[in-house]
UniProtKB/Swiss-Prot annotation:
HAMAP family: CbiN
Protein name (Swiss-Prot/TrEMBL): Cobalt transport protein CbiN
Function description: Part of the energy-coupling factor (ECF) transporter complex CbiMNOQ involved in cobalt import.
Membrane topology summary: Multi-pass membrane protein
Higher taxonomy: Bacteria, Pseudomonadati, Pseudomonadota, Gammaproteobacteria, Enterobacterales
Family: Belongs to the CbiN family.
Source superkingdom: Bacteria
Gene: cbiN
Source species of the chain: Salmonella paratyphi B (strain ATCC BAA-1250 / SPB7)
Any one GO BP annotation for this protein: cobalamin biosynthetic process
């Protein structure tokens, strides 16, 4: 019971704390930050290629990023579940 309560408090703290840390700060993507650093270090640098698809807005970009992560997690956990089920089946036999 004590361990469960402690874990619950930690989860709640992890959810609530980001609202108070760096309040009002600007959050940018790592791609934009990398681009500005490259331009500062090597202004003559030219990208190798252009993106195949440029999302219309930041919201769509976030949606696609989230969908990609969700699909990846689904594949990983499907494989883990399949292996676990196969192991249980083999243990019973």
């Amino acid at each position: 019971m004590k361990k469960t309560l402690m874990l619950l408090v930690m989860v709640v703290a992890l959810v609530i704390l980001p609202f108070f840390i760096n309040h009002g700060g600007e959050y940018g993507g790592s791609d934009g930050e990398a681009e500005s650093q490259i331009q500062a270090l090597a202004p003559q640098y030219k990208p190798w290629f252009q993106p195949l698809y440029e999302p219309a807005s930041g919201e769509i970009e976030s949606l696609l990023f989230t969908l990609q992560g969700s699909l990846g997690a689904a594949v990983i956990f499907y494989i883990l579940g399949y292996c676990k089920g196969k192991q249980r089946r083999d243990d019973r036999a």
